[in-house]
Curated annotation (Swiss-Prot):
<keyword id="KW-0349">Heme</keyword>
<comment type="subunit">
    <text>Homodimer which associates with NirD.</text>
</comment>
<dbReference type="InterPro" id="IPR005117">
    <property type="entry name" value="NiRdtase/SiRdtase_haem-b_fer"/>
</dbReference>
<feature type="binding site">
    <location>
        <position position="462"/>
    </location>
    <ligand>
        <name>[2Fe-2S] cluster</name>
    </ligand>
</feature>
<keyword id="KW-0520">NAD</keyword>
<dbReference type="GO" id="GO:0009344">
    <property type="term" value="C:nitrite reductase complex [NAD(P)H]"/>
</dbReference>
<feature type="binding site">
    <location>
        <position position="641"/>
    </location>
    <ligand>
        <name>[4Fe-4S] cluster</name>
    </ligand>
</feature>
<keyword id="KW-0004">4Fe-4S</keyword>
<dbReference type="GO" id="GO:0020037">
    <property type="term" value="F:heme binding"/>
</dbReference>
<dbReference type="Pfam" id="PF01077">
    <property type="entry name" value="NIR_SIR"/>
</dbReference>
<feature type="binding site">
    <location>
        <position position="459"/>
    </location>
    <ligand>
        <name>[2Fe-2S] cluster</name>
    </ligand>
</feature>
<dbReference type="GO" id="GO:0042128">
    <property type="term" value="P:nitrate assimilation"/>
</dbReference>
<comment type="pathway">
    <text>Nitrogen metabolism; nitrate reduction (assimilation).</text>
</comment>
<dbReference type="InterPro" id="IPR023753">
    <property type="entry name" value="FAD/NAD-binding_dom"/>
</dbReference>
<protein>
    <recommendedName>
        <fullName>Nitrite reductase (NADH) large subunit</fullName>
        <ecNumber>1.7.1.15</ecNumber>
    </recommendedName>
</protein>
<dbReference type="GO" id="GO:0046872">
    <property type="term" value="F:metal ion binding"/>
</dbReference>
<feature type="binding site" description="axial binding residue">
    <location>
        <position position="685"/>
    </location>
    <ligand>
        <name>siroheme</name>
    </ligand>
</feature>
Length: 847
């Protein structure tokens, strides 16, 4: 069977999604795929385009896994544009003079930004907000500018305004309509959004018709002149006034094009030529062009199914949207303007908290038609499902948007009421039925469901509903959703933390007597030991705490494969003096230890006998060192590059900040180990974005990333805050650390903790930055108290003779373990293998 020649014109988000869907459902060997990628880089995420200003690396936005196209034999023509299509011969001619033949053609040409016919709009320092190249040009211009304007007060316009504000520009938004986001919000919602945005320093000008832009000004380089006679001087202008389908190729080759633009498609996404499909913003279905990515993804799925002979149809798309604009949560659902005949409204307004909510319901009060949410979108998921699935409303619909008081909860739609066809994840078109099928296959955690179905791996907004579906299905199957720590405590780790803190419990025995049963086990003892340390930070080798410690904490060192231990003193930020180096060398030589520089920028000594540990540490402490907590569930290190102190590219003192942070948080017990990274510029030599906490210097301060991870399951850290000063950075870190300590499950790193946190990074931002839970003052106080209690555990041990008896090999003998054997290698030594070991006589012959 010959391969199907498949050509794809366009390598944007929808074009790439088509390829992914195709390869999910069919073998790449069945196709000969050629992709025209007009831009200088392969598919990237335009939805999160503004984040580019934070990390300045196109790779961060890339949608294509490394080696993906090569692995599947896909030919991608980067920087090459399709210029003509010969439908009779089924051949495409490119800007590079190439000819590509096809059996099936996918047109995913997207859209182009429309600029109103304003005189002067094509002059220097006038931009659009569409590609990475656009953002580079805007940022370059911003460096020599003070004042900028965004023409257009819709979704993308406000996103662009947020980017300009973050660049330090005096920002103005110019909107032709009398309100912002006129398509998604009603009048009151638009006014509330305007007030919130203006309170952040962005100037908003509505009902403004721009007549011309002239290259002159007293305080700036340009002057915008409006129809009402007013003027505004700015240095540069960003246009965000809508999009138009890119259908020129279709017109040239004779395909049907809609009167208002867009390549006409049927329910199978076929054009007027059955061998040519159109998907995404270039397509017109029933005279409608969809400017959001989710409908484009659905079109890609339909086109794939039709090519493979499966039944599927595009039936339109819901254009509801939830997003954060300039830090303001905004949501619009369904008939947000109440245009349905007989529609009635319920309105909630809290001026003190700047929250506005409106429900639009049917005349009989039984069906939700639409909603407007400004300032708080926590109800968005439930309200959207009510609209999409026409679920009957409760007796008092206003209860859906009124705040819950005195512990009373809001009425829930109940996931059982949702049909299996209900779309839970719009990013990947995952239905409730898809989730149930995955649960029946054994996916019994949110993380497992995400891996199996991709639900929640896009914008993350569906995670609360995914969790509800999971818990409901597990309950139906009789699988108890139990987060108890173990059989001895009917509480979760988080609940035990609060019991210990509130009741001032200081020992395992006291906690067991008050809230547990039995004698404890290998699960609860080390967990409670960690909790007690996280709450009170007492010396872990106190007699009442010693039985709770695992093997490493028991001896304040990591046990190795041969029964010896490693010794790793702290070197904050990777900094160490020549005297310190010589001291480590002398000690390693004296005790015959193997030495190595670790991946954490620390000097490690291996092969220490247990009974030598106190003396080794006594000498290290005398040389100015302290424990590095390499054995503990705590901060291990803050890895740094040399930063602006030495590097000609550095823009921030990464070493200085790394040293400060490592010393600030050292010795504080956390649910799992933590690693920090601090980079002095975006070249990222300390690999900060692969750490639990990553900090990168910018021209304006520091970018703070959290919940990254290396190891077996690498995870890129999420940006928590951008361009913040040192004081704000430390404040956010104090809160983040304590919130993690309070809420994470036992032995959970920050990466899976965030992945299982309902609301993900947006929720974490709301807690840490916006104080959503009203906890920040308490979190800062708890961190301050823990820091005051920090001690070097080895200093305490060396100064406590009774604590050193545990380091003897044998209770009744001063002899050492004869099974420890070393062999030489590369001028040092290592543990002997079983084949290299010399037999040991354990019983002496006294004859």
């Amino acid at each position: 069977m010959s391969k199907v020649r498949l050509a794809i014109i366009g390598n944007g988000m929808v074009g790439h999604r088509f390829i992914e869907d195709l390869l999910d459902k069919s073998d790449a060997a069945n196709f000969d795929i050629t992709v025209f990628c007009e831009e200088p880089r392969i598919a990237y995420d335009r939805v999160h385009l503004s984040s580019y200003f934070s990390h300045h690396t196109a790779e961060e936005l890339s949608l294509v896994r490394e080696g993906f196209y090569e692995k599947h034999g896909i030919k991608v023509l980067v920087g090459e544009r399709a210029i003509t299509i010969n439908r009779q011969e089924k051949v495409i001619h490119s800007s590079a003079g190439r000819t590509v033949f096809y059996d099936k053609l996918i047109m995913a040409t997207g859209s182009y930004p429309w600029i109103p016919p304003i005189k002067g709009s094509d002059t220097q320092d006038c931009f659009v907000y569409r590609t990475i190249e656009d953002l580079n040009a805007i940022e370059s211009c911003a460096r020599r500018s003070k004042r900028g304007a965004v023409v257009g007060g819709g979704l993308l316009g406000l996103e662009a305004a947020g980017a300009l504000k973050n660049l330090g520009i005096e920002t103005h938004v110019i909107e032709f309509a009398p309100m912002l986001m006129a398509e998604q919000l009603d009048q009151m919602g638009g006014e509330q959004l305007r007030r919130k945005i203006e309170s952040m320093g962005v100037r908003v000008h509505t009902s403004k018709n721009t007549l011309e832009i002239v290259q002159e000004g007293v305080e700036a380089r340009k002057t915008m002149r409006f129809a009402d006679g007013s003027e505004l001087e700015v240095d540069f202008i960003v246009f965000s006034t809508g999009i138009r389908p890119r259908d020129k190729l279709a017109t040239q080759c004779g395909l049907d094009v809609a009167p208002r633009g867009g390549i006409v498609i049927n329910d199978s996404c076929q054009t007027s030529d059955p061998d040519i499909y159109a998907i995404g913003e270039c397509a017109s279905w029933n005279n409608r062009v969809f400017g959001l990515v989710a409908p484009g993804y659905k079109m890609a799925q339909v086109a794939v199914d039709h090519i493979l002979g499966s039944e599927n149809a595009f039936e339109g798309a819901d254009l509801s949207a939830k997003l954060k604009l300039l830090g303001v949560d905004v949501g619009g659902i369904g008939d947000a303007h109440g245009r349905t005949p007989g529609a009635r409204s319920y309105v909630y307004l809290d001026e003190s908290k700047e929250i506005y909510k409106r429900l639009i319901v049917s005349e009989d009060n039984k069906t939700l038609l639409g909603a407007v949410l400004v300032g708080d979108t926590s109800d968005y998921g439930n309200l959207l499902q009510l609209v999409l699935n026409a679920i009957e409303l409760p007796e008092n619909p206003d209860s859906l948007i009124l705040p819950a008081h005195s512990g009373s909860g809001k009425p829930s739609i109940g996931v059982d009421k949702l049909p299996d066809s209900a779309q839970i994840c719009s990013c990947f078109d995952v239905t409730k039925g898809d989730l149930i099928a995955a649960i029946n296959k054994g996916c019994h955690t949110v993380a497992a469901l995400k891996a199996e179905t991709k639900a929640g791996t896009g914008c993350g907004g569906c995670i609360p509903l995914v969790t509800q579906v999971l818990n409901a299905e597990l309950a139906k199957q009789g699988i108890e959703v139990n987060n108890n720590l173990c059989e001895h405590f009917a509480y979760s780790r988080q609940e035990l933390f609060h019991l210990i803190r509130v009741e001032g419990i200081k020992t395992f025995e006291e906690l067991l007597a008050k809230h547990g049963k039995g004698y404890g086990c290998e699960v609860c003892k080390p967990t409670v030991g960690s909790l007690l340390a996280s709450c009170w930070n007492e010396y872990i080798l106190k007699p009442e705490h010693t039985p709770l410690q695992d093997s490493n904490d028991n001896f304040l060192a990591n046990i190795q494969k041969d029964g010896t231990y490693s010794v790793i003193p702290r070197s904050p930020g990777g900094e160490i003096t020549p005297e310190g180096l010589m001291a480590v060398g002398r000690i390693a030589r004296e005790f015959n230890l193997y030495t190595k520089i670790t991946g954490s920028q620390r000097l490690a000594m291996f092969g220490a006998q247990k009974d030598d540990l106190p003396e080794i540490w006594r000498q290290l402490i005398e040389a100015g060192f302290e424990t590095g907590h390499a054995y503990a569930k705590a901060l291990r290190m803050a890895k740094t590059c040399v930063g602006s102190t030495w590097c000609r590219y550095g823009v921030g003192d990464s070493v200085g900040l790394g040293v400060e942070l490592e010393n600030r948080y050292k010795g504080i017990r956390t649910p799992h180990k933590m690693k920090f990274g601090v980079s002095g510029c975006t070249r990222e030599c300390s690999e900060a974005q692969g750490k639990d906490v990553g900090i990168i210097a910018t021209e304006k301060g520091w970018n703070l990333y959290v919940c990254g991870n290396g190891g077996m399951k690498p995870r890129h850290a999420d940006l928590l805050a951008a361009d913040i000063d040192r004081e704000t950075l430390i404040k956010y870190l104090d809160r983040f650390m304590m919130f993690y300590i309070r809420t994470a499950d036992k032995l959970t790193r920050t990466a899976p903790w965030l992945e299982n946190l309902e609301g993900g990074i947006d929720y974490l931002k709301a807690v840490i930055i916006d104080d959503k839970l009203g906890l920040n003052a308490h979190l800062e106080e708890e961190m301050a108290r823990l820091r005051e209690a920090v001690l070097c555990e080895w200093t305490e041990t060396v100064n406590t003779p009774s604590a050193q008896t545990r380091f003897k090999h044998f209770i009744n003998s001063d002899k050492r373990d004869p099974n420890v054997q070393m062999v030489p290698e590369r001028e040092q030594h290592r543990p002997a293998t079983p084949y290299e070991r010399i037999p040991v006589t354990l019983v002496e012959d006294n004859a």
